[in-house]
């Protein structure tokens, strides 16, 4: 639901105790390990990493007499989606993704050094044990990810959402588990018999096979569920207003009316969403253009069709 949150935790084991080296020594030691438990939050920032480091410092610790571990157990180890082009500059699909790479531990080590926390150990990967204490928990509302995912057509955000869906079927989250949820929804939407293939969450995969019929079925399914529709409608780009269609349909009846998501690959251009017809009826639509040498031609056609439906 819309109250879902992405969760990233900083945990630790062992105890904090003073150094016994010198009587006057004020050094506080963590006699244990630190764990960063990933939730595939794609919005983690440099400031968030600094907060993680400060949460360890706030324990009174200036030396970690143990190791720092990355807990990536939230999802499988697949770094890329099935059928992605090898020469694309794709983000790494890690439970601890940071700035599109799997380098959160390195960033944390730098932040700890800035907080004058010394690591007397090494870094690695290990699942956080039950009973570990939580130093800090970062919870990010789903809509904070949904909005830029839809408005800006962010592929990493879409993949992170996909794995959250897969997580509802148990750990570790996988693309196949997310696809099982998609298949179940497709049946409920009345399009289960339509020819299709789901491969990833962003649409980058060359193995995806969808039709306009299926997209409209999903849109109608969402429309009938008020909470889902409200969140989706708020997140969709608005013609001539914002997002990926900010510069499209200006000066037409579609401006400010069409709420729709773009889809773009080499030779493919699509647009799907909602608009309100002159009689007040809300329409769900999907337009797919394939085999186009220049995307602008497809977009111009889509814009004209949307304007016609709004008149």
What are these regions (language model features)?
Residues 1-3, 187, 261-266:
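Short, solvent-exposed secondary-structure boundary motifs
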Residues 14-26, 131, 173, 184-188, ...:
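Short, mixed-charge aromatic SLiMs
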Residues 37-40, 70-73, 100, 153, ...:
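Active-site-proximal beta-strand/loop segments in catalytic clefts of secreted hydrolases
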Residues 194-311:
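C-terminal soluble interaction/assembly domains
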Residues 36-38, 144, 148, 159-163, ...:
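Short, well-ordered beta-strand elements
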Residues 1-104, 116-147, 152-155, 167-168:
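Active-site-adjacent loops and short helices of periplasmic peptidoglycan-processing enzymes
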Residues 99-233:
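A small/polar active-site loop signature that marks catalytic segments
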